[in-house]
């Protein structure tokens, strides 16, 4: 099974593409990293234009990698000046995935860290080591 994982944002959308072999169990040997990177939007453009960039680049990733499903990081609301823009970018991601008919599962950052490191409060450096 091929999975496209997405960490949405307006300035940067992180992504990773993995193949998972369900018959190999839960360890890292059951997963093969195919691609990962960041979709960066032009900060000089309007929010609407940046969302178009996200949708365009995400469509290209889907066409190239042909994932069976997608995983999108859940967003928690907190007081920040960019909260609305991030939520809007997340909406563009979900809309694009849905247009391609991809099943979507959502995980909190804590759930992702727990699965990677065994510690839901791990910092990003420790999480990267496990990736």
Predicted regions and their residues:
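Phosphate- and other anionic-substrate recognition elements at nucleic-acid/protein interfaces
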Residues: 1-128
């Amino acid at each position: 099974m091929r999975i496209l994982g997405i960490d949405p944002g307006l300035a940067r959308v992180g992504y990773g593409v993995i193949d998972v072999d369900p018959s190999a169990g839960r360890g890292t040997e059951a997963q093969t990293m195919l691609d990962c990177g960041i979709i960066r939007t032009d900060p000089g453009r309007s929010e609407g234009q940046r969302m178009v960039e996200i949708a365009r680049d995400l469509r290209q990733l889907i066409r190239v990698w042909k994932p069976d499903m997608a995983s999108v990081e859940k967003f928690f609301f907190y007081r920040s000046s960019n909260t609305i823009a991030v939520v809007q970018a997340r909406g563009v991601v979900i809309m694009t995935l849905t247009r391609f008919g991809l099943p979507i599962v959502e995980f909190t950052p804590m759930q992702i860290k727990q699965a990677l490191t065994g510690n839901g409060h791990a910092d990003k450096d420790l999480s990267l080591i496990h990736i």
